[in-house]
Amino acid sequence: MSKEEAIEVEGTVIEPLPNAMFRVELENGHVVLAHISGKMRKYFIKILPGDKVTVELSPYDLSRGRITYRAK
C-alpha cells in the first residue's frame, strides 16, 4: 500500500504511444504521460485519442500517471 494517496484528475487523450502509454492533457492544461491500469489491460479496454479519462497521479511525480477509467 502506498503511504500517500494518489491525486485523481480528469483529462483527454492526445496521442497513443508504444507499450500502452498515452499522452494525456489534464483539465488544468498540463500534459502528462500515462499508462493503462492492470484491470483495463486485462479486460482489453480500448482507449483512442479524444477519449475522456480519469488519471491517478502520484504526489511524488506529477508528470506521470495511471489511467483508471475511460468515460463512455
Swiss-Prot record:
Keywords from the UniProt entry: Cytoplasm, Initiation factor, Protein biosynthesis, RNA-binding, rRNA-binding
Q: Which domain of life is it from?
A: Bacteria
Is tRNA-binding given among the entry's keywords? Answer: no
Q: Which GO terms describe its cellular component?
A: cytosol
Could you tell me which InterPro entries the record lists for this protein?
NA-bd_OB-fold (IPR012340), RNA-binding_domain_S1_IF1 (IPR006196), S1_domain (IPR003029), TIF_IF1 (IPR004368)
Q: Specify the S1-like domain's residue ranges.
A: 1-72
The molecular function GO annotations come to: ribosome binding; rRNA binding; translation initiation factor activity
HAMAP family from the entry?
IF_1
Subunit architecture:
Component of the 30S ribosomal translation pre-initiation complex which assembles on the 30S ribosome in the order IF-2 and IF-3, IF-1 and N-formylmethionyl-tRNA(fMet); mRNA recruitment can occur at any time during PIC assembly.
Q: Quote the PANTHER family the UniProt record gives.
A: TRANSLATION INITIATION FACTOR IF-1, CHLOROPLASTIC (PTHR33370:SF1)
Job of this protein: One of the essential components for the initiation of protein synthesis. Stabilizes the binding of IF-2 and IF-3 on the 30S subunit to which N-formylmethionyl-tRNA(fMet) subsequently binds. Helps modulate mRNA selection, yielding the 30S pre-initiation complex (PIC). Upon addition of the 50S ribosomal subunit IF-1, IF-2 and IF-3 are released leaving the mature 70S translation initiation complex.
The protein, known as:
Translation initiation factor IF-1
Organism source for this protein?
Geobacter metallireducens (strain ATCC 53774 / DSM 7210 / GS-15)
Q: What is the lineage of its organism?
A: Bacteria, Pseudomonadati, Thermodesulfobacteriota, Desulfuromonadia, Geobacterales
